[in-house]
Swiss-Prot record:
This is Cytochrome c'. Binds 1 heme c group covalently per subunit. GO terms for biological process: electron transport chain. GO terms for cellular component: periplasmic space. Cytochrome c' is the most widely occurring bacterial c-type cytochrome. Cytochromes c' are high-spin proteins and the heme has no sixth ligand. Their exact function is not known. One of its GO terms (molecular function) is electron transfer activity. It comes from Rhodocyclus tenuis. The keyword Heme applies. Heme c binds at residues 12, 72, 122, 125-126.
């Protein structure tokens, strides 16, 4: 039996919360006086794992409206502009995978620079496909 729209929306909302948590904890680590390599690796690897998890399947037809934990904030354009969605998804995956590689080096300045690149891919998707309400 296929998953219900409500479940798909809940799962993607949950995944984005885990992503947000790891972006926040990595930023706090980068901004701290003493960068912790192990914590950076944990956060970066989690971000990369989410990027590579196949979340696109959670945006099935019928989930452009509705409620998971809260009403979905995805714009209808996400479901009609496949080319642009593909571009932002590929960019996010690429930069998230690079973040995991850079985090493994323990170079705080390099992690900070790559973190910024990941953040830009998040912003690109939010600007085009996330409602502000």
């Amino acid at each position: 039996e296929p998953a219900k729209s409500e479940d798909l929306i809940k799962w993607r909302q949950s995944a984005y919360q885990v992503l947000h948590w790891n972006m926040d904890r990595l930023k706090a680590n980068i901004d701290s006086p003493q960068y912790n390599k192990d914590d950076g690796i944990k956060a970066a690897n989690t971000i990369a794992a989410i990027a590579n998890s196949g979340m696109g399947s959670l945006f099935a037809a019928g989930t452009e409206t509705g409620k998971g934990w809260h009403p979905t904030s995805v714009k209808p354009a996400f479901f009609t502009d496949g080319k642009k969605v593909g571009e932002v998804a590929v960019a996010f995956n690429k930069e998230a995978n690079e973040l995991a590689k850079v985090a493994a080096t323990g170079d705080a300045a390099a992690v900070k620079a790559q973190f910024g690149k990941v953040g830009q891919t998040c912003k690109a998707c939010h600007d085009d496909f996330r409602r502000k309400d």
